[in-house]
UniProtKB/Swiss-Prot annotation:
The chain crosses the membrane at residues 1-21, 38-58, 131-151. This is Uncharacterized acyltransferase C1851.02. Belongs to the 1-acyl-sn-glycerol-3-phosphate acyltransferase family. CDD domains: LPLAT_AGPAT-like. Keywords: Acyltransferase, Endoplasmic reticulum, Membrane, Transferase, Transmembrane, Transmembrane helix. It comes from Schizosaccharomyces pombe (strain 972 / ATCC 24843) (Fission yeast). It is found in: Endoplasmic reticulum membrane. SMART domains: PlsC. GO terms for molecular function: 1-acylglycerol-3-phosphate O-acyltransferase activity. Pfam families: Acyltransferase (PF01553).
Length: 279
């Protein structure tokens, strides 16, 4: 009990300290980047610990995936408020109209977890790389909340997991969030890396629509290679759904191309959001 109290006290102390420093001090660029980056991971650890508890409760109530929603919202509320880094959503109503869909999203950096927190619905689940399940606390939360894990190095296993996920989507009416590029781009330009086919096979197997989601290129706000981490707001644009009803594996390439084109166009369209143009 004494250890738990000490841990909670230390957590609260760190949290209050981070809040004060971030709000009332202007730090040099490099120090600001490392400080805010550390704060992000601190908030993630706090949210993951909360997520373990939330997921246990959600699982006992018979709806374990709700643990992901509660944890994502807690992280976004905490981190966005303290760091003053927010996302605005355009066309959010599209997400709420569909009980089940594959959400195809571009992946820029580790800060995309904030975009997840801003966008997530109560029936959403993410697909994550299998190695994350072994990360203390974070992995426990992900296991308890029924995150879909995938090992991309073993194609046969990945195919089986997608088939299982498709059955689960149809049975439970859940939507799956997929970073379809497969890796972080850290791009400063409004464009995608080539999309992987897994998300499209999943959508075809489940016979649910693909909903492309374009997260504005926010390298002017957060860009680890150049140690940039500023306050600000970025835009998330939800695009029109792409139906898969009646489609088969033979249509995957066409679906991928249609999605990729729509997302690249949207990234260019929203690139200037929140940016101060030079005169």
């Amino acid at each position: 009990m004494g250890f738990i109290k000490s841990t909670l006290l230390a957590t609260v102390t760190v949290f209050v300290g981070l809040c004060g420093i971030n709000r009332f001090f202007t730090l040099p660029k490099c120090i600001r980047y490392h400080f805010r980056y550390f704060a992000c991971h601190t908030f993630l650890a706090i949210s993951s610990a909360y997520g373990v508890i939330a997921s246990v409760v959600a699982r006992l109530c018979g709806y374990p995936v709700m643990g992901q929603y509660l944890t994502a919202k807690a992280y976004y509320g905490l981190a966005s408020t303290i760091l003053d880094f927010r996302f605005k959503i355009e066309n959010e109503e599209i997400l709420r109209k569909h009980k089940s869909a594959v959400l195809v999203v571009n992946h820029q950096s580790e800060l995309d977890i904030l975009a997840i927190g801003r966008t997530f619905g109560p029936n959403y689940s993410v697909i994550a790389k299998k190695s994350l399940r072994y990360v203390p606390i974070l992995g426990w939360f992900m296991i308890l909340s029924d995150v879909v894990f995938i090992d991309r190095s073993r194609r046969s296993d990945a195919i089986q997991l997608f088939a299982k996920a498709a059955r689960r989507m149809r049975k439970e009416n859940i939507s799956i969030w997929v970073f379809a590029e497969g890796t972080r781009s850290y791009s400063l330009k409004p464009c995608l890396l080539p999309l992987k086919k897994g998300a499209f096979h999943l959508a075809v197997q489940a016979q649910v629509p693909i909903i492309p989601i374009a997260i504005q290129t926010y390298g002017h706000l957060f860009h680890p290679p150049t140690k940039v981490f500023n306050k600000g707001e970025a835009l998330i644009k939800v695009l029109d759904p792409i139906p898969t009803e009646g489609k088969t594996a033979e249509d995957v390439n066409d679906l991928l191309h249609e999605t990729e084109t729509a997302m690249n166009n949207a990234l260019v369209e929203i690139d200037d959001y929140g940016k101060v143009k030079k005169q």
